[in-house]
Amino acid sequence: YKISAGPDDSMCKYLKSRCYAVQADTSLYVNCKRLRYKKFRFGGWYAPALRIGDHIYFSAIPLGSVAAGSDATMDVMLGGQFGDAIAASALISKRVYYEIDPETNKVGFVGKERMEELLGGHPDWKAAYLNENSESAKVTDKYLRLLKAEEK
């Protein structure tokens, strides 16, 4: 997402370069400009996020080893830049969840292992999550929202 402040250029620049997160009503957005997963950058945009406890979870495109292991990748037999572009385009519409550690500000992937930890106190939710057999943002989001609703 791109967030702007209308005609106020100085506020737009502030939102783009200095703001860590923006909350509008009940929606939270995290600025990905300075965030990295391992050595990969997310880009200069805002991602929709959820705050559960002290942790912030946001959805973004799969990066690095997450992209390589994602069910979003496809076997492309074309080589060179053209083949790379086709393979990368398959990931554009895919999303996975990442977690920002509040103590270190490090970004980690929210995969099956992490979701098993988070859902540990809810065996029925955990079993349902494992039956879905997907690390996509659509599936992960459903269970993170259940945890968020329980927190209230």
Enumerate the language-model features and the residues they cover.
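Aromatic-patch recognition
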Residues: 1-123
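C-terminal partner/receptor-binding element of secreted or periplasmic proteins
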Residues: 115-152
